[in-house]
Amino acid sequence: MPRPDKAAVVAELKEEFQTSSGAVLTEYRGLTVAQLTELRRSLGQNARFRVAKNTLTKIAAKEAGVTDSEVLDLLKGPSAIAFVKGDVVEAAKGLRDFAKENAALVIKGGLIDGKPMTPEEITKLADLESREVLLSKLAGAFKAKQSQAAAVFQALPSKAVRLVQALADKRGESQ
């Protein structure tokens, strides 16, 4: 590639590193173009799967502030990166599921919210439910606790009223 083209690729990759919430590094040796297209579709709207030269990717990562040698050392062999803009769990699930079906895709590791991740950690992340599901479960738990508290607070005055009524009825009977 001529020098201006390489600079443009480095600039694009640098922007991807800076604007992404996560980057998952994979090895794609043996995948066909059709399989790569299928993988890109399976990742959805919030992730972008890029194939770039390792040297250019390392330069872009360093320019973007990625200094962790664990991540940079993963850039060996035919590497591709899934840059995640939204829900990292959804993208991790897409990569894990595709890797199960296609043994040629190997998850090498990644960088999520600036922290290096091993392939095992990315697989564990894929086992989690999505952010929206977890938030809805949390909201449901809060609502249930509030309903229980409201029932307790409502029960106390009603018990007191019934007690006073029972005492009044008893006094009325005794007179």
UniProtKB/Swiss-Prot annotation:
Pfam families: Ribosomal_L10 (PF00466). Keywords: Ribonucleoprotein, Ribosomal protein, RNA-binding, rRNA-binding. One of its GO terms (biological process) is translation. GO terms for cellular component: large ribosomal subunit. SUPFAM superfamilies: Ribosomal protein L10-like (SSF160369). It comes from the Bacteria. Part of the ribosomal stalk of the 50S ribosomal subunit. The N-terminus interacts with L11 and the large rRNA to form the base of the stalk. The C-terminus forms an elongated spine to which L12 dimers bind in a sequential fashion forming a multimeric L10(L12)X complex. Belongs to the universal ribosomal protein uL10 family. This is Large ribosomal subunit protein uL10. It comes from Thermobifida fusca (strain YX). The lineage of its organism: Bacteria, Bacillati, Actinomycetota, Actinomycetes, Streptosporangiales.
